[in-house]
Amino acid sequence: MQPIWAVGLMTGTVLDGNIDVALLKTDGETIAEFGAYALKPYPRWIRDLLEQAQAEARVWNFEGAEPAIFAEAEEALTRAQSAAVRELVEESGLSMADIGVVGFHGQTVLHRAPQAGRLGDTRQLGDGRLMSQLLATKVAYDFRTADIRAGGQGAPLAAVYHAALLRSADASGNTAILNLGGVGNITWWDGDDALVAFDTGPANAPINDFMKKRGLGEMDRDGALAAKGKVDEDRLAELLKHPYLIAPYPKSLDRFDFTEMMADGLNEENGAATLTAFTTSAVGKALDILPRRPKRLAVSGGGRRNPTMMHMLVERAEVELVPVEALGWRGDAVEAECFAFLAVRVLRGLPISFPSTTGVPEPMTGGELVG
């Protein structure tokens, strides 16, 4: 198949108020061209609606009827993200007729990993049929459910796109890709058949929630608060005994599996420092269980903008860092690009998850396609 223009959409679990939207020209196996990307802000009322949906999802916990707010939030975010797609396409001098498919991840409100004798569950808000009608184009969506039903983790799904990025940058196995969003996830590829991906632990979510809880703003901007604090090493040592951190992959996390309560009783500076140290130390433990420990990490996601977190990564995970921009990638666009890439794979019937990335029995396709 010849490469086609696809649009990818992603909104992270930290609910930073932005819709990540990116254009990518691809055949679902290689990257022909990076197109434009943008961070399009949600109206405040939609962000508030999504925060309420996320809170009600935790109470619901996959038991009984879904909260009524889901339908309201689903329609609102679908319309907002459809508008973001159209804006980006038109700003790029293209029309929707030029777009082969849109990859619509939706908003994760709850994710539950499988356990022995029990399949996992996942819920992303997003109405792919409505988006297809609004944009008059094909839409791939609901990327995780098939994987979960087959016994997989349903996450992370970025591995096959990360491998395509590494193919042109470093296919030696010496470089892994670390994404620091609400949760951290890592992809390692040996350049051949070994492709491994899993969630490393929390990333920005507990720190952001800690800041909000203390009335200090939305996030620890530039890691300024953590930089003033002292890590509670005794508490950190206890936190690092969590069984998830040494469990074998594949494995995945919900955004609330590790919370800001890990810093209860600490002052503002020391709490921020200890949570940041936990995120980075968890990455170090993740590197230790890979088939081969990479020498460097290409870091994407919002966490890469936190100098304190980056310094602690070098120090506590004992690894070299390289900005994804130095490899010719766009750190803010990688996740949205990923869902453009996966959408083309859905269109072609190619696998999007694998035994070594989500734990499914065999490489499998996924996602719903409409339009």
UniProtKB/Swiss-Prot annotation:
Residues the entry annotates as binding ATP: 12-20
Gene3D superfamilies the record matches: 3.30.420.40
Gene Ontology molecular functions: ATP binding; kinase activity; phosphotransferase activity, alcohol group as acceptor
Superkingdom field: Bacteria
Keyword set includes Nucleotide-binding: yes
Keyword Zinc-finger: no
GO BP term (any one): amino sugar metabolic process
Catalytically driven reaction(s): 1,6-anhydro-N-acetyl-beta-muramate + ATP + H2O = N-acetyl-D-muramate 6-phosphate + ADP + H(+)
Pathway annotation from the record: Amino-sugar metabolism; 1,6-anhydro-N-acetylmuramate degradation; Cell wall biogenesis; peptidoglycan recycling
Protein keywords: ATP-binding, Carbohydrate metabolism, Kinase, Nucleotide-binding, Transferase
EC number: 2.7.1.170
Pfam families hit by this protein: AnmK
Family from the record: Belongs to the anhydro-N-acetylmuramic acid kinase family.
Function of the molecule: Catalyzes the specific phosphorylation of 1,6-anhydro-N-acetylmuramic acid (anhMurNAc) with the simultaneous cleavage of the 1,6-anhydro ring, generating MurNAc-6-P. Is required for the utilization of anhMurNAc either imported from the medium or derived from its own cell wall murein, and thus plays a role in cell wall recycling.
Name this protein carries in UniProt: Anhydro-N-acetylmuramic acid kinase
Lineage summary: Bacteria, Pseudomonadati, Pseudomonadota, Alphaproteobacteria, Hyphomicrobiales
Gene field: anmK
